[in-house]
């Protein structure tokens, strides 16, 4: 009979749940392995077939490691705060908590139907007050360390969108919201900010400690954007004591500076603009306020700007340079000011060309048609003339330091992390602002500061979060009657995901976020699998929080995740990204119902290398299901009993291929090359179908090897061997090195250099025996009969060349 996936999968999922088969307990005598998935946001759409790919990969590794004797921690949880739930609630009038819990239940059911070996007793949910109590507690440690502060930050304010709200840079297109097309303005707003820049160097340097894809490391290095250069101070003409400081990586080009640019938001713009230019500058600032940072810094964008009417003195040659304001300079980068050298920077060149500003060549090679950025001898550069870039940089930095108008400096592209959102559905920030101007933290023994339940989650319209509407929650009094207001901004969705792997080690602890004992034993995460879209922000924020906790002596390792793997994307069958709008989304529930979870798991691991993006293919899925059935039929007869040919008798016919399979599958699983491991398992099954007797020892080993991939099928087959215990903790099969030795080789036989036959010989056979066998071969006869054999050349184990005349 065919394999009944529905009955068998339900049976074993029930068994695992009842027996808590995958429960992890701290055992210091056992070596540990911590396999972690990036926990999902439980959306209303539920799982799609892209989710199980990464989850199956970590599950294969978790099941392998258990069988190899490791104590495995393999947990799952929910990154459940987030904007979609709030937007859904606004649209429908439902409570975002109810909507989120309903989605979590649906996700959990879907994930459990796929047979993943999670320890569900460790499940976490970022919206659970018992969880976010510790998110708030960590925020308080950041605050005490001076790493959390308030600042006026330029934000994208859309007064007409959702009743007035802040939108991210990525959500602004042509000065309007991406959704709805509402006008967006750049306005300053009070925000909480985390000082991630204090860790910039360590976030770069410690990438050397982890086994991550080089592409991800490079993306993080570029995001942090450490650049070594110099600061240069320009005195402003007619303004005593006022200087404009710029950062440059090309101090050697200072002789070629022809103007200075201030970001429109730079406070010096209003201070320095002349009365004659004020109207033009104000109009320009208003225009720029409707552009996002992304739009402003597009390289292909038409350059815009306005002259302020003011000048600075170039310290190196005394020339007066005009001060312009232009949107391609961001106030959030460096000092919000740049020195412009049109002959050496393409943006400066385009700007100078448009506004007819001087362009002075300072390095040989400039052709007047575009900026020259290659190396060369300096010209028009006084004491730098004739030097190359490296020499000239060093000499100019020396000169700046000697003359007290600048010096060596390191700059970072990384900005501090804006940590507040004007939203309801997030962790409340545990801060009180008192009427006397002071700020205090909510006492630790009063945490969690719970998110108040309310029907009114409409935006406040003032830029504050909807929490500002809840008067009795916002207003507080201390024991002396002093009045204060709670912080109404909430934390971003990144907060809960910046430490969740630590909570999994001790998820029910109500005294601390996790005990030292649990953290010391389980840390760090050995394998972390998730999408490449999180290569920068989530991983950077998580590493930052981890390092802060390390500095506080609360975690034992400098880095949280030792090995990172990004699974590829599963595309639609048309090679496009799966999306509801394209109608190409495949629901895993349908696949599990029709073919079973083991088929889906097998197919997703067999599609191609784990890291590559591949299109969904129904034929491939069907082929995987056929192989599941083929494995079942190999061992089970039509009455669903173990076949008689499975016995303790071993005639040796499968010995070589079995040992080869154990070696290859073990090696490939360890390297997460699942597709090639499956190919080898298929080779073994093909060979097993060719022989009369199936040795019990080899069949047990084979079933163990398929267990990480197809656990339901493996458990059922294992039970058919009269085994009473789960296969989960059975020892992983080993191979015999001696059985892998090739005792026979295939040799090519050539006659006068042309291939005429192939012969099998014992490895390292005597040359005389090889000659005799070659000459005796029936395919060689016709080419040597009646001819004079001049000589026979034998290249051991490879070629026999017979020379005839």
Curated annotation (Swiss-Prot):
EC number(s) stated in the UniProt entry for this protein: 6.1.1.4
Motif ('KMSKS' region): 577-581
UniProt keyword annotations, A-Z: Aminoacyl-tRNA synthetase, ATP-binding, Cytoplasm, Ligase, Nucleotide-binding, Protein biosynthesis
Signal peptide bounds: none
Intracellular or extracellular location(s): Cytoplasm
Ranges spanned by the short sequence motif 'HIGH' region, renumbered to the chain: 40-51
Organism domain of life: Bacteria
A Gene Ontology cellular-component term: cytosol
GO BP of this protein: leucyl-tRNA aminoacylation
Gene3D superfamilies for the chain: 3.10.20.590, HUPs, Isoleucyl-tRNA Synthetase, Domain 1
Binding-site list for ATP: 580
Alphabetical list of Pfam families matching this protein: Anticodon_1, tRNA-synt_1, tRNA-synt_1_2, tRNA-synt_1g
Catalytic activity: tRNA(Leu) + L-leucine + ATP = L-leucyl-tRNA(Leu) + AMP + diphosphate
Main localization, broad class: cytoplasm
Entry's Gene Ontology molecular function annotations: aminoacyl-tRNA deacylase activity; ATP binding; leucine-tRNA ligase activity
Top EC group: ligase
Similarity comment: family membership: Belongs to the class-I aminoacyl-tRNA synthetase family.
Record NCBIfam families: leuS_bact (TIGR00396)
UniProt-recorded name of the protein: Leucine--tRNA ligase
Lineage, top ranks: Bacteria, Bacillati, Bacillota, Bacilli, Lactobacillales
